[in-house]
Amino acid sequence: MGIEIKSHDEIALMREAGLVVHEVLDELSKIAAPGITLDELDAVAKRETERRGAACAFIGLYGFPKHICISVNDQVVHGIPGKRKLLDGDLVKLDHGAVVKGWYGDAARTVPVGKISPEAQKLVDATRESLEAAIRAMVPGNRVSDIGAAVQGVIEPHGFGIVRDYVGHGIGKRPHEDPQVPNYGPALWTRGQPNPRLRPGMVLAVEPMINAGTHEVRTLGDGWTVVTRDGRNSAHFEHTIAVTEDGPVVLTGPA
């Protein structure tokens, strides 16, 4: 499939979905405290999404069994909520999608549980800053590679590992569309990977996944949960962003 350019009206519908995602992540962030189970967070995600007239995007997607992806500590992405309780010092990654009138929004954030270590805080801050830098690069005329280069420029001085096996993506009527959006510059890309110019109407889900140690990851036996190969922490932030003539517009931000 080629890159689908969205109209102003379509981007407005995606903003509706994005606002639901933002508000639900806000609700979850408030209650992500020691003692709560991941299943309880999943139930809140379902309730709060549906209460806003939207549907949860991830349940059943490629067979995913829950409403939201929740990954803790060395879990990078695609964690399946269960009976695990959050503990003081955990890093919990909340990755949520919502659908409104057939249009998707997708965002993620890393939430400190209780008091986290200075090293963990540095990882969280750098990952958030790398997403902010990526968003600033999303102007017409730049290329997709400029997004990843912006992430890499923030992360590499810290010595953290940028996950290479999973990348950002286009989004719209489908949760995953072209193009792929790596979180690193083109020197690390697969030979021949498309590197289109950014045009008004492109909507991308940009999501740096940053590890405290190695960039290498592996998938657990459940077929979903991705963890760091060295067992160290990982952080993840994501926004759905529209490229416009006036610059980037974050569709999963606050009202």
Residue ranges of each PLM-predicted region?
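Active-site neighborhoods and metal-handling regions in enzymes and metal-associated proteins
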Residues: 1-255
